[in-house]
C-alpha cells in the first residue's frame, strides 16, 4: 500500500504536474493552428477532400469551436508565400519544443543546445502532423476500403461491417501508440531505450482516446461554459481539452521515468551481485 501511495505521490501528483501540463497545453494551443494549416496544405496538394477534417471537428467539438477553427479550411491560404510557411513552421515547432523541455524536466536531463533542439522540434512537428493526419484522414480511407470490399464480396455486408467496427479501434490504438512511443523516445535530450516507454505510450494512447470521447460527450451534452466565460467559451473549451491531453502525456512521461529508474536499479543490483561473487571467488582462491 505504501508503494502505491509513494508512486502516486511522486509520479502522479508530483510538483511538475502543477506546471508542465499547463505549459504544454498553452504551447499546443498556439501550435495547433499552424499545424492544421500545414495539414490543410498537404491535403490540398494531394487533392484529398477537406470535409473529413471538418467532420472530425464537428464530431469532437461543439459548434462554436468548429466555427472558431473554420477559417483555416475555408479561407484561401497562400502557401506559396515563403514567409507564411516559415512562420507557420516556427510557431508549430514551439509546441514540440515544449515536449522536449517537459521530457528533460521529468528525466532530470540538461537541455541540449538550442540548434539541436530546433532540429529535433522540426522532426517532432512532422511526427505530430502525421499523428493528426492519421486521426482525421484514416477514418475516411477506412470507409472507402470498406465500400470497395462490400462491392467485391457481395452478400458479406454484415460480416465485413462488423469486422470493420471491431478492428477500427485496435488499429487506431496501435498506430497512435507507435507515434506516441516515438515522441517519448526521441523527445528527451538523452538516449532512452524504447523498451522503457511502452507503458507510458500505451497509457497515453488509450487515455487520449477515452478522454477525447468523454470530453466531447460532456461538452456537447452537459457542460455550459458559456454561462461563465461568455464569448471566450470556445477558446476555453480548446484550452481545457489540450490541458487534459497534456496532463495525460506528462503522466505517461512519469510512468516511463519510473520504469527507467526501476530497470536501472535492477541492473545496478545485478552488477553489484556479480562483483560480490567475483570478490568471494577471489578470496576462496587465495
Please state what every model-predicted region is.
Residues 1-286:
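Membrane-embedded alpha-helices and immediately adjacent juxtamembrane helical segments
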